[in-house]
Amino acid sequence: MKIRIIGSVGSGKTTLAKKLSEWYQIDYFETDRIVWKREGIEVRRTDAEKIATLKEILQQENWIIEGVHLEAWATESIDQADVIIFLDLPKKQIRQQLRKRQIKQLLRIERAHYPVRFNMLKKMFYWDDLFDQRTKPLIEKRMMQNPEKWLVIKEKNEIQEIEKRMAQYI
């Protein structure tokens, strides 16, 4: 089973990837970790490094890849996926989840893979707006090419139903 999860920042991609990983006993990978080397300081990988890292993951029999990235280096993960889950949640839900995440990270209740700063919430709101303006139209266009591969989640409570809905792809 090859699963690709796409959605805006704060839509629940990582949470869902972890759940699916546990349910199906499949390793999950975050595209952010493909893009960024996080060894003390954050360094963006070159396109060649990203492609090589992704290629290594894609060679596995089963995988779950989550992330917002749709650039050329990441498209192979969409092409090879058996199912693509698009978390298309309402902006109000995403903003609420981002606020909760920021508070938990600042209080050190939840770990982050990036430096947690007070201005990060503002950046995430900006990235969410960019997703709606730039990425979402690209996703909608790709969905038309292979609609049978796509599973669109419009509300957070639908995520709880996903195991039932995933049965059709197994």
Language-model features: where?
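Hydrophobic anchor at the beta1->P-loop junction of P-loop NTPases
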Residues: 5
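Walker A (P-loop) ATP-phosphate-binding motif of ABC ATPase nucleotide-binding domains
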Residues: 2
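The conserved Walker
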Residues: 9
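Conserved substrate/cofactor phosphate-moiety recognition/catalytic segment
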Residues: 18, 22-61
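NTP-dependent small-molecule kinase module
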Residues: 23, 127-170
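Glycine-rich phosphate-binding loop used to anchor ATP phosphates in small-molecule kinases
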Residues: 51-92
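A glycine- and Lys/Arg-enriched "phosphate-lid" helix/loop adjacent to the NTP-binding pocket
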Residues: 88-134
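Conserved lysine of the Walker
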Residues: 13
